[in-house]
């Protein structure tokens, strides 16, 4: 894509005004911006993602990889969620986990980049219309999609970056509602990223208690 941008850029007038927009602005993007702009002014619009973190109750679980499934079942049995999104880091794990949940009486849908767009739209509509309450997703749905009734996000696999974490958990508690997030920490790399999130965003996170106070997140919708 960068080559296409450069090709277009070279055909534009030398004397011009250039504006570039990005949802996030990591150092790698800043480097690219400098190639197309001279002494640019950086404008940061309200960082909704970070502000939203403060409205979420965030929990973590230290465990081994082999313990994840049992802990997930325990959480789904005990948490009174409206809808939940469970994030994993690969398409294979996305399909496998969704299948396992469905076979164990937790009807689930799996959404990832390998699905045809028509199928993704169909599954998206099922979830948005509250016909499905559990979604297993890859980073594809880590940002840019909002569901009114999602009040729980579970990081079955820790995100690969602090920025991705912020966007993932931001799927919970949208539109002024409450929400909780639960992150599985299975190794040192998981802990490193989680600690970075806590430090950079000045948020509080607690070990997952035996029972979560239902008053800290939205109750079930009544239809």
Annotate the PLM regions.
Residues 1-223:
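Conserved helicase RecA-like core
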């Amino acid at each position: 894509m960068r080559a296409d941008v450069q090709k277009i850029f070279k055909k534009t007038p030398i004397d011009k005004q250039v504006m570039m927009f990005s949802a996030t602005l990591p150092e790698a993007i800043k480097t690219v911006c400098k190639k197309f702009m001279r002494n640019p002014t950086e404008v940061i619009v309200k960082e909704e993602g970070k502000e939203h973190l403060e409205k979420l109750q965030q929990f973590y679980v230290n465990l081994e990889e082999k313990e994840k499934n049992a802990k997930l079942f325990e959480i789904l049995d005990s948490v009174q969620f409206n809808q939940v999104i469970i994030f994993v880091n690969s398409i294979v794990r996305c399909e496998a986990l969704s299948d396992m949940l469905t076979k164990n009486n937790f009807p689930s849908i799996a959404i990832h980049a390998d699905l045809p767009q028509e199928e993704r739209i169909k599954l998206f509509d099922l979830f948005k219309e509250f016909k499905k309450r559990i979604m297993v997703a890859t980073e594809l749905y880590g940002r840019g999609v909002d569901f009114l009734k999602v009040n729980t996000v579970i990081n079955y696999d820790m995100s690969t970056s602090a920025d991705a974490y912020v966007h993932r958990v931001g799927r919970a508690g949208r539109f002024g509602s409450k929400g909780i997030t639960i992150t599985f920490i299975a190794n040192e790399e998981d802990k490193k990223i989680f600690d970075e999130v806590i430090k950079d965003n000045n948020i509080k996170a607690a070990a997952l208690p035996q029972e979560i106070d239902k008053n800290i997140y939205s109750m079930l919708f009544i239809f």
